[in-house]
Amino acid sequence: RCKPCFTTDPQMSKKCADCCGGXKX
């Protein structure tokens, strides 16, 4: 599941992008 993508951690941001397809999410 995709969680809200708002973080300053590059590692988390990358994971988020992989999940949200751009971290918008």
From Swiss-Prot:
Family annotation (Pfam families): Toxin_5 (PF05294)
Q: Which GO terms describe its cellular component?
A: extracellular region
Main location (coarse class): secreted
Q: In which tissues is it expressed?
A: Expressed by the venom gland.
**InterPro entries associated with the record:** Scorpion_toxin-like_sf (IPR036574), Scorpion_toxinS_Cl_inh (IPR007958)
Disulfide linkages recorded for this protein, renumbered to the chain, are 2-19
Tell me where in or outside the cell this protein is found. Secreted
Q: Which GO terms describe its molecular function?
A: chloride channel regulator activity; toxin activity
**Keywords assigned by UniProt?**
Chloride channel impairing toxin, Disulfide bond, Ion channel impairing toxin, Secreted, Toxin, Voltage-gated chloride channel impairing toxin
State the family it belongs to. Belongs to the short scorpion toxin superfamily. Chloride channel inhibitor family.
The protein's job, in short, is:
Toxin with unknown function in healthy organisms. On glioma cells, interacts with chloride channels (probably ClC-3/CLCN3) and MMP2 at the surface of glioma cells. This complex is then internalized via caveolae, thus inhibiting the chloride channels necessary for cell shrinkage and tumor propagation.
Name the record gives this protein? Toxin PBITx1
